[in-house]
């Protein structure tokens, strides 16, 4: 039996051999990968990743990454690949990712899935309690003005 499996890094063909009942990798077809998946520098490719993953309000989300990481210099950014300060309240620690682009996907899954357009995105962030800083939205607006 031949099985086609799609993943983040391409398509894999798996041939199940009936007599052994275990998968044997037969052939790998790699799809063209976005350049940001190969980059270790989120500041150079974050906007491309936000577009690739169809993130809404990209400029605001980009500003969040700048603010949360101190311009991509924080420990949480460098050691955990966490661009948005995503926190695991059960483990009482920040989420750790193998690659910074995984934090973009996590942002979509944990934060942005709750957003309902056409609501104001800044108000949405306040409503969900994204940050404890009462000046958080004003800081984001200033960053958006500065970086566009």
Language model features with spans:
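Catalytic cores of secreted/periplasmic lytic hydrolases that degrade extracellular macromolecules
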Residues: 1-148
């Amino acid at each position: 039996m031949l099985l086609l499996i799609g993943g983040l890094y391409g398509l894999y063909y798996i041939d199940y051999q009936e007599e052994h009942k275990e998968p044997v990798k037969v052939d790998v077809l790699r799809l063209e990968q976005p350049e940001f998946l190969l980059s270790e520098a989120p500041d150079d490719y974050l906007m491309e990743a936000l577009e690739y993953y169809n993130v809404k309000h990209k400029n605001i989300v980009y500003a969040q990454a700048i603010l949360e990481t101190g311009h991509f210099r924080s420990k949480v950014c460098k050691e955990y690949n966490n661009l948005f300060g995503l926190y695991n309240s059960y483990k009482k620690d920040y989420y750790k990712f193998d690659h910074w682009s995984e934090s973009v996907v996590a942002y979509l899954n944990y934060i942005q899935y709750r957003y309902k357009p056409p609501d104001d995105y800044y108000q949405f962030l306040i409503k969900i309690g994204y940050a404890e800083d009462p000046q958080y939205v004003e800081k984001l607006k200033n960053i958006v003005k500065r970086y566009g």
